[in-house]
Regions:
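Subset of outer-membrane beta-barrel
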Residues: 16-319
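Sec-dependent N-terminal signal peptides
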Residues: 3-13
Length: 319
């Protein structure tokens, strides 16, 4: 246990993240609950959004599930996601999902650093998922993803990739999960410069995640996830995530998490404080009619580098 605590601490302090690479717009989080728990959901049955966390979790689907997320963020950024999951008897599930991440009102500049027109950039990810259980302990799942990117009107990219995930049930309170993301993933860009069209390939970093979800404490769930990211240049970076969820008497849930705040820094850079960014949020069921409820989740992102507050909302329901 002491070694595990030291390992977690060291990974948080020296961790790196995937910003600045192809597909980084998909890493922020698909829902408010995911963000408030620091993204440590690779082994958790997230209602309405499990396709984004781990396709192997689809085998836990017992009814039709829908998840919708609206995230209007500072600096004209936004993320929207939709997820649909359906049970396939006796022990499988299928899902469809889409996520869009974008930024508006980007100020353009020419080679002389003079302001030109404003433009927008966005990334879209469409996912088809399937998960199946093999007995009572093990489940496997796959994602097939189509990705699209647009920067203004002259820069467009697309590609196809996949994910493979697993879930292992140690007991009814402890789940172990893992996923390999962005297998064979890249953008095939087409760029228009004047009257010429040029093409090139930009590869995604590969990501390997392993985590657990524990619900053996009364009214408390604990989550842990360790990510290993391998960049196109074969640099290896680490990312540790920890989350906790507290269930109150009125079915309201308080959520807290912690993840890295910064990536690697140049030699000689002075770092003030630990490399940790706290996350938090809340969730509550809302009655729609009779016995039908929808789950409302909220998370607040205070920002990492002074970019301002961002408010994240998600809705999920079963039918």
């Amino acid at each position: 246990m002491r070694f595990l605590v030291i390992l977690i601490f060291v990974n948080i302090v020296i961790a790196d993240y995937g910003g600045g690479y192809a597909g980084s717009g998909f890493q922020y989080g698909s829902s408010a609950r995911e963000f408030s728990l620091a993204g440590a959901l690779v082994a958790d049955k997230t209602p309405g959004f499990c396709v984004f966390s781990n396709p192997a979790l689809l085998q836990f689907t017992r009814s039709n599930q829908v998840g919708v997320s609206f995230q209007n963020m500072s600096l004209d950024r936004s993320i929207q996601s939709f997820n649909y999951a359906k049970r396939l008897p006796p022990n499988a599930g299928v899902g469809l999902a889409i996520l869009q991440s974008g930024t508006d009102n980007i100020q353009g500049r020419n080679l002389m650093n003079q302001e030109t027109e404003s433009f927008s950039a966005k990334e879209i990810e469409g996912i088809m998922s399937f998960g199946v259980a093999f007995g009572s302990k093990l489940a496997l799942g796959i994602n097939i993803k189509a990705v699209f990117a647009t920067i203004d009107k002259d820069y467009k990219g697309n590609g196809i990739s996949g994910d493979i995930g697993f879930i292992y049930k140690l007991n009814r309170h402890l789940l172990i999960g893992g996923i390999m993301k962005n297998l064979n993933a890249s953008y095939n860009w087409k760029v228009i410069i004047g009257e010429d069209e040029r093409s090139y390939e930009e590869k995604f970093p590969r990501s390997y995640s392993l985590g657990m979800a524990y619900s053996g404490l009364k009214g408390i769930s604990l989550f842990f996830q360790e990510d290993v990211m391998i960049t196109p240049n074969n640099d290896v970076n680490y990312h540790t995530r920890i989350g906790s969820e507290f269930r109150l008497a009125n079915k309201t849930k308080l959520r807290f998490g912690a993840k890295q705040a910064r990536g690697t820094t140049p030699s000689g850079t002075i770092m003030n404080g630990l490399n940790i960014k706290p996350t938090f949020g809340i969730g509550t069921p809302l009655k729609v009619w009779q016995r039908q409820y929808t789950q409302l989740d909220y998370a607040l992102d205070p920002g990492s580098v002074g970019e301002g507050l961002s408010h994240l909302f998600s809705f999920s329901f079963k039918f």
